[in-house]
């Protein structure tokens, strides 16, 4: 360029927008379009603008009339964070409340029935001595006697834990102690056994893989070790693109977590990964960030599905989809698809026709779309992600997983993530992994570092558990401002507890498989927004769900294994926050072994964690009073269940009527639709379920039992069961009789000799 005025010919700097307009050099090669644009804008401003320009001669030269005086450049735009309120649990088409209401099918309003019966009006009030204490005494009592630190034996081997137990008769205590002593030897052996795929045998099973087999299957251990040593101060040091960094900054992500620091660089190289870390450590972002970064360099004009993310539950799939959208919000051209059961099939088909870059799905609906949705195929898939991979590898998903592996291209990248990852080679062979890098950040089967684990010993008071739950929630959250998750074993229990709590004046939600998908999402969203502070759910919600600020997890029923326990309590104390879990412990050996495993984990990781394992004391006298109130409501509870069932039958009949009308009205259109197919016949499904049930119920024998069984098979007549108290008494009597007869025979022989 040639500068038109000599005044600017030798300048070492370029004049900026803040310099006086009179001093701006006139360039010979000026842009005519820009000049015309300037003129048109000046004309629009009219006479008032001319006055301002004339007055501008008297103003400071550094001030321009078209600029905001308070404007500043934000140099740290990538470090700004919005007030993130957690992930959205809304399916496609549910972006606002009106759409959601139109989308949700009509169903029975249980809260309305409970209100008609006198519930959900006022919190039940139970008189007790505890409520008469002053605030100071309450605090002292909570600090001094609510919690007792548990030793490795758990609950002090049957020592009384509270004043309520003193009223128990000595005879009952002696019987319980005798039972505990009888079970003690059995429990020691059961520590070496698997409790329905849980416990310590998983570690033993992993050792069954020989060193040569591991060397052939996995990448060299040095790769994983080096990855774990890498710690990055911020995401910029990971060499990520600016749009991805901007998306992370908008979520408040500042420093990569250990699992993210270890896995992101390796995932960007295209290598297979098997990764494990504690719950709430950022595993979803650990695989979503490298995926989005790699998709930035995809061919822009070719629409194809390149990434498949498989998850075990629908709610988790919806959450992961939202995580991906939030991270990629500033990345242009990346599309997401959701394929989960329970939601509108036609909407999903239309969305998958556009071949989104990333499809997040549950296995069953994913196979359904591959087989029956036009224009959707997986021929160009480059990355397969399995979140909660240990659950996906279990028997319930085995058939679907084998079908999916046969449909996907073999030359893909595989990323497997879980908090309780089982990296046994036998279970991973079917996934066609290529020298996967194994990255286990935390010790296996470890709870969150700031989790306080409390245990309440129920003994033989199972009938008091609903009253105990009510009293515990009221004590932990008297104002209803904390989020509390309650885990139960059965769907029926969750539903009944919701009715009981409602009649006692406590608003709670429920989440389990008997609800429709719309009801499930509605329950999660109400809980997230604190419309209901308590959510009673089955293990459906134990994995992956990341709802912010869940302060307490209550295990109303003990889980089947320690792994499931870890996933349950992992709903709280996430991402470095503090949390508390309270578990109701029965007298079964399975319950007590889980408690021992939890205490042992805390003891072994004392130097690495701030967590505690405590025994919680409760006022059983007050709980007895609450239970009397609950028992007085039994007839009302049954009436509510009957009324709800009747309303459901009416709604079902109306639905069948509408279905019949549609069949008549749109008969030709419905008959013209191609029949949907599945990879299994009905008989295959039944056989698969039977085989799965048999494999789950098969007991794993330890070395001692296996030797006894082998000896019995050889004809040595070894006992196949452990001696009971009755057997021991009978043995003692037989031994005594033998000794008596031997002594009498000796005396007779001595007399005959004489």
From Swiss-Prot:
SMART domains in alphabetical order: DEXDc (SM00487), HELICc (SM00490)
Acidic residues bias: start-end ranges: 19-34, 167-193, 202-211
Limits of the Helicase ATP-binding domain: 264-439
Chain spans, region Disordered: 1-61, 119-227, 675-754
Motif (DEAD box): 387-390
Assigned keywords, A-Z: ATP-binding, Coiled coil, Helicase, Hydrolase, Nucleotide-binding, Nucleus, Phosphoprotein, Ribosome biogenesis, RNA-binding
Motif Q motif: where in chain: 233-261
Known catalytic reactions: ATP + H2O = ADP + phosphate + H(+)
Domain of life: Eukaryota
Compositional bias segments (type: Basic and acidic residues): 124-142, 724-736
UniProt subunit comment: Interacts with RRP1 and associates with pre-ribosomal particles.
Name by which UniProt lists this protein: ATP-dependent RNA helicase DRS1
Native species: Saccharomyces cerevisiae (strain YJM789) (Baker's yeast)
Organism lineage string: Eukaryota, Fungi, Dikarya, Ascomycota, Saccharomycotina
């Amino acid at each position: 360029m040639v500068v038109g005025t000599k005044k600017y010919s030798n300048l070492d700097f370029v004049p900026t927008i803040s310099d006086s307009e009179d001093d701006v050099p006139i360039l010979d090669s000026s842009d005519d379009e820009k000049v015309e644009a300037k003129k048109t804008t000046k004309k629009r401003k009219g006479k008032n603008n001319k006055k301002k320009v004339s007055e501008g001669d008297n103003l400071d030269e550094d001030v321009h009339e078209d600029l905001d005086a308070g404007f500043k450049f934000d140099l740290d735009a990538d470090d700004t964070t919005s007030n993130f309120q957690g992930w959205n649990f809304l399916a496609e088409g549910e972006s606002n409340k009106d759409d959601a209401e139109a989308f949700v099918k009509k169903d029975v309003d249980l809260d309305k029935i409970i209100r008609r019966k006198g519930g959900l009006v006022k919190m039940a009030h139970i008189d007790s001595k505890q409520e008469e204490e002053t605030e100071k005494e309450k605090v002292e009592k909570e600090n001094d006697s609510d919690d007792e630190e548990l030793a490795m034996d758990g609950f002090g081997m049957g020592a009384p834990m509270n004043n309520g137990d003193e009223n128990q008769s000595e005879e009952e205590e002696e019987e319980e102690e005798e039972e505990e002593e009888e079970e003690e030897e059995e429990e020691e052996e059961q520590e070496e056994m698997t409790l329905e795929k849980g416990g310590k045998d998983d570690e033993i099973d992993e050792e069954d893989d020989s060193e040569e087999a591991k060397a052939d299957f996995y990448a060299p251990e040095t790769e994983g070790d080096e990855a774990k040593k890498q710690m990055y101060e911020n995401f910029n040091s990971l060499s990520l693109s600016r749009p991805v960094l901007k998306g992370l900054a908008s979520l408040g992500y500042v420093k990569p977590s250990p699992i993210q620091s270890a896995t992101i660089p390796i995932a960007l190289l295209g290598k297979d990964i098997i990764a494990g870390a504690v719950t709430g450590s950022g595993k979803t972002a650990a695989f979503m960030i490298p995926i989005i970064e790699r998709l930035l360099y995809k061919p822009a004009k070719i629409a194809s599905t390149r990434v498949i993310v498989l998850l075990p539950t629908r709610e988790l799939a919806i959450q992961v989809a939202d995580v991906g959208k939030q991270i990629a919000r500033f990345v242009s051209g990346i599309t997401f698809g959701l394929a989960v059961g329970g939601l509108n099939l036609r909407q999903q088909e239309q969305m998958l026709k556009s071949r989104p870059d990333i499809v997040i799905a549950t296995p069953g609906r994913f196979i359904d779309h591959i087989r029956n949705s036009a224009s959707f195929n997986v021929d160009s898939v480059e990355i397969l992600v399995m979140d909660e991979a240990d659950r996906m590898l279990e028997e319930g998903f085995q058939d679907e997983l084998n079908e999916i592996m046969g449909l996907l291209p073999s030359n893909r990248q595989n990323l497997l993530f879980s908090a309780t990852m089982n990296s046994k080679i036998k279970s991973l062979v079917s996934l066609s992994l290529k020298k996967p890098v194994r990255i286990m950040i935390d010790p296996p089967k470890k709870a969150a570092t700031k989790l306080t684990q409390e245990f309440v010993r129920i003994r033989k008071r199972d009938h008091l558990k609903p009253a105990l739950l009510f009293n515990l929630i009221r004590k932990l959250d008297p104002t209803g401002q904390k989020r509390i998750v309650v885990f139960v074993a059965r769907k029926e229990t969750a539903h009944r507890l919701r009715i009981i709590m409602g009649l006692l004046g406590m608003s709670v939600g429920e989440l389990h498989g008997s609800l429709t998908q719309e009801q499930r999402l509605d329950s999660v969203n109400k809980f997230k927004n604190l419309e209901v502070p308590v959510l009673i759910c089955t293990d459906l919600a134990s994995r992956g769900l990341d709802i912010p600020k869940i302060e307490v997890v209550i295990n109303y029923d003990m889980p089947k294994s320690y792994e499931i326990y870890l996933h349950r309590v992992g709903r709280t104390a996430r991402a470095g926050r503090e949390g508390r879990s309270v578990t109701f412990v029965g007298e079964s050996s399975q319950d007590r072994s889980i408690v021992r495993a939890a205490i042992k984990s805390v003891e072994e990781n004392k130097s690495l964690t701030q967590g505690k394992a405590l025994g919680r004391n409760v006022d059983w006298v007050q709980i007895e009073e609450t239970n009397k109130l609950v028992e007085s409501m039994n007839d009302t509870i049954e009436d509510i269940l009957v009324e709800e069932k009747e309303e459901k039958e009416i709604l079902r009949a109306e639905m069948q009527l509408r279905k019949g009308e549609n069949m008549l009205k749109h008969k030709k259109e419905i008959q013209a639709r191609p029949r949907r197919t599945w990879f299994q016949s009905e008989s295959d499904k039944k056989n698969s379920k039977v085989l799965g049930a048999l494999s789950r119920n098969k007991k794993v024998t330890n070395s001692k039992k296996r030797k006894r069984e082998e000896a019995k098979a050889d004809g040595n007549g070894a006992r196949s069961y452990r001696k009971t108290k009755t057997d021991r008494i009978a043995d003692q009597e037989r031994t005594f009789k033998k000794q008596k007869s031997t002594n009498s025979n000796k005396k007779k022989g001595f007399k005959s000799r004489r």
